[in-house]
From Swiss-Prot:
InterPro entries: Adenyl_kinase_AK6, P-loop_NTPase. It comes from Mus musculus (Mouse). PANTHER family: ADENYLATE KINASE ISOENZYME 6, POS9-ACTIVATING FACTOR FAP7-RELATED. Its EC number is 2.7.4.3. SUPFAM superfamilies: P-loop containing nucleoside triphosphate hydrolases. It is found in: Cytoplasm; Nucleus, Nucleoplasm; Nucleus, Cajal body. This is Adenylate kinase isoenzyme 6. One of its GO terms (cellular component) is Cajal body. Residues 108-118 are annotated as: LID. It catalyses: AMP + ATP = 2 ADP; ATP + H2O = ADP + phosphate + H(+).
Length: 172
């Protein structure tokens, strides 16, 4: 049976991981958090002193994911999307969060002030939505609100319906 590949993207703190894990457990699709994948495989290309975090080796991440993406049925969670091959994804969801809510979430994570401000700016200017629109066909890119628990449930239901329909349409 053919299964779709889904990309969940958005600024850090918008709820990609919470949504992705819950969606995977309900749909049976495989969940891949690119940050965890990079950590486990040491898929890094240096260290960013300013942000206090490792720099992702994008080519190695793509190589690492290629086989499972070809098989299908994968939910990928990452705060960027411009380096993934366009052919990988059947749909892209950009999660959006109000600045006040996002600020509190990132503060709770212990982000330094520069990292906090840059991520809030990223959300204000819709940087990741613009990146998604530039990287994929516009008709497969959708924005979802992610401010409160009720919206999480709505998003799971909406994406689950989409998965069911995609499976029906692609498995005669």
């Amino acid at each position: 049976m053919k299964l779709p590949n889904i990309l969940l993207t958005g600024t850090p703190g918008v709820g990609k991981t919470t949504l992705g894990k819950e969606l995977a457990s309900r749909s049976g699709l495989k969940y891949v958090n690119v940050g965890d994948l990079a950590r486990e495989g040491q898929l890094y290309d240096g260290y960013d002193e300013e942000y206090g975090c490792p720099i992702l080796d994008e080519d190695r991440v793509v190589d690492e994911l290629e086989h499972q993406m070809q098989e299908g049925g994968v939910i990928v969670d990452y705060h960027g999307c411009d380096f993934f091959p366009e052919r990988w994804f059947h749909i892209v969801f950009v999660l959006r969060t109000d600045n006040g809510v996002l600020y509190k979430r990132l503060e709770t994570r212990g982000y330094n002030e520069k990292k906090l401000q840059d991520n809030i700016q990223c959300e204000i200017f819709q940087v990741l939505y613009e990146e998604a629109i530039a990287s994929y066909k516009e008709e497969i890119v959708h924005q979802l609100p992610s401010n409160e628990p009720e919206q999480l449930e709505d998003n799971i239901n909406q994406i689950s319906k989409w998965i069911e329909q995609w499976v029906k349409d692609h498995n005669p």
